[in-house]
Amino acid sequence: GAGTIATIYSDTAIVGTITVTASATAYNTSSDYRLKDNQAPLTGSGAFIDALQPKTWTWKADGSAGVGFIAHEVQEVSPSSVVGEKDGEQMQAMEYGSAEFIANIIAELQSLRKRVAQLEGK
């Protein structure tokens, strides 16, 4: 059936859940306003995006094409989006859907849409 199949805790606070429906599995991170203090508009999204270095590559394992980012390069911009250390024992992993990534992309898109509207005289 549908519903929450797992709840993730940090100390005594719920920080996430895994929920399922008939057609989807969702990994949810807590985002309720009641858990947050000092809320403010996000600034610096342009610099965040400009610091990222999108790349293409060929995977060594099978020669297939890849597109995205190099984890240790992203770690310099967004440490919370990357797990592990450059040249560490374990290969690094990156969360492409991190809240920091999505929030900065949306903030910059909103800024650009506002600028286009101003330039178009709307």
Ranges and model annotations:
Residues G3, T7-F101, E108, L112-K122:
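C-terminal intramolecular chaperone/autoprocessing and neck/assembly modules of extracellular spikes
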